[in-house]
């Protein structure tokens, strides 16, 4: 399914898989929930929210109040063309640019400034990432799940990365075929990216900034009661989905999200060889991250395939995984 009309995405098409990351660091004893016979249910579905607990409602701001904000604004504009400057000006006038409804209360402006002035991950371009982030916030309907082709000059590198540690000749041959993705299974991930850009632009900009930085990851603090009705059930879910996290109490947890290890190569290719209607480097990183969350850290951006304990298919996410991701 496409994301061009993502608010009406048809999820009747089955989505699909999983793997693991590092063990989690938790102050909460999870032994009581290891052997639950029934998978715990999620808290009732609510609109995406980035707020840490007890964050007050935010006023809309349309004026640059401080010298720091004015400097950030001027710096961002200096890296954009005429059309880009017009879009940013409109984001300011509509209150989007100074929106601070993000997990760390940073504004869209703050994160765009970091993208423009701080180093990006290897092979990523700050101006491209800045332009793509602004465009997605201004008009989320441009977000797509359309994979790009692998240019000849990248083919050998991509196949080698996908066949890393494989010794069986059949597996190696199959691995060389799997990198030519024709039909994407990232519908849920693209839909989640869309909703984040549309509903929480400051959090979207924060994700874009952190995921494209050299650390290639983003932290997010959540209230455990937003994940499940019972704290131990929330911990069970985080462990079941292999989400790296830390807890200091029974109320909140700091989660770490990251794209899969091959996403950076896909993003590098899209930075230099993006064709019209294909995903941007930002789309690659965002969608890989959300696929990792839903597939228990088993997604591979080179093949658009996954493994996982909750589904035996190797594409997309099933409903349970979709609900957890969102």
Spans of features found by a protein language model:
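Active-site nucleophile-adjacent alpha helix/oxyanion-hole segment immediately C-terminal to the catalytic cysteine
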Residues: 69, 83, 89-95, 99-101, ...
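Non-Sec secretion/translocation targeting segments of pathogen effectors
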Residues: 1-58
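Basic/polar, acidic-poor N-terminal "presequence/leader" segments
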Residues: 49-93
């Amino acid at each position: 399914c496409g994301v061009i009309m993502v608010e009406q995405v048809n999820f009747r098409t089955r989505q699909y898989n999983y793997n693991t990351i590092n063990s989690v660091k938790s102050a909460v004893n999870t032994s009581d929930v290891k052997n639950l016979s029934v998978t715990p249910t999620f808290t009732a579905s609510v609109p995406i929210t980035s707020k840490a607990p007890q964050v007050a409602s935010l006023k809309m701001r349309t004026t640059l109040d401080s010298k720091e904000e004015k400097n950030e604004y001027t710096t961002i504009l200096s890296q954009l063309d005429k059309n880009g400057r017009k879009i940013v000006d409109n984001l300011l006038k509509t209150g989007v640019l100074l929106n601070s409804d993000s997990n760390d209360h940073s504004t869209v402006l703050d994160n765009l400034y970091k993208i423009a002035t701080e180093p990006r991950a290897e092979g990523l371009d700050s101006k491209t990432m800045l332009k793509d982030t602004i465009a997605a916030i201004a008009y989320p309907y441009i977000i797509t799940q359309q994979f790009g082709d692998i240019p000849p000059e990248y083919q050998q590198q991509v196949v080698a990365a996908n066949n890393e540690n494989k010794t069986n000749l059949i597996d190696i041959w199959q691995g060389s075929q799997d990198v030519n993705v024709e039909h994407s299974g990232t519908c849920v991930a693209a839909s989640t990216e869309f909703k984040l850009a549309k509903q929480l632009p400051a959090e979207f900009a924060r994700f874009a900034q952190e995921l494209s930085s050299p650390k290639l990851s983003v932290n997010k603090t959540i209230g455990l009661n937003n994940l499940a009705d019972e704290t131990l059930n929330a911990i069970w879910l985080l462990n079941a989905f292999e989400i790296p996290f830390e807890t200091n109490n029974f109320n909140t947890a700091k989660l770490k999200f990251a794209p899969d290890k091959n996403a950076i190569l896909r993003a590098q290719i899209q930075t230099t060889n993006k064709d019209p209607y294909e995903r941007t480097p930002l789309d690659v990183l965002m969608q890989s991250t959300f696929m990792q969350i839903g597939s228990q850290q088993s997604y591979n951006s080179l093949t658009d395939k996954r493994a996982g304990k909750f589904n035996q298919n190797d594409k997309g996410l099933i409903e349970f995984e979709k609900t957890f991701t969102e």
